[in-house]
Amino acid sequence: ATTELLNQPLIVFIDDTTQWNPQNHDGSTGLLTTLREGLRRSLNLISVRVVQELIEPKDIVQNAKDFGMTTYIRAVDAIALGVSEVYPLEITAAYGTIANNGIYSRPLAITRIEDRHGRIIKEFIPESKEVQDEATVYILRDMMKSVVDAGTGGALRWKYKFRAPAAGKTGTTNSKADAW
């Protein structure tokens, strides 16, 4: 959370031959910026530097698998900016893992089947496993709270008056076709 990276222009490799010069959503640059501040402000340049300087793309892919992702995710620098798509249910389960202190629970659509008298015919129990240690997830979740409380997700608080505890990560696709 306190690690600092340079908030300056860089080159991202999308594949072996394609390069891209990403920008922060507001076009800003800066000096050394903490990971917490980069996440709070949704700074693309900081996200890419995490991949280029701290964590290899292949390790991010493995973490994604541990958090329940089954879709193909390309192990390239641009992974930091969402170069690969994932199923909404899988990303929801991944966020659930963060909320659940690092315990991943496989999503279930049906938890039990009852007859017309309420007797249980079949019960389904979600598969759960620890995929990340609680201390690491605590730091991540705390950083994500700053997105909602004082960052790019702040409209949840000031515009919609949502007061319950919340954590999040904002982002948009190119041309703002999707916004999460």
Label every model-predicted segment.
Residues 17-24, 54-93, 107-109:
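Mid-domain, small-residue-enriched loop/turn segments at the edges of structured enzyme/sensor domains
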Residues 87-180:
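A penicillin-recognizing enzyme superfamily signal
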Residues 4-6, 80, 112:
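Soluble periplasmic/extracytoplasmic beta-strand elements of cell-envelope proteins
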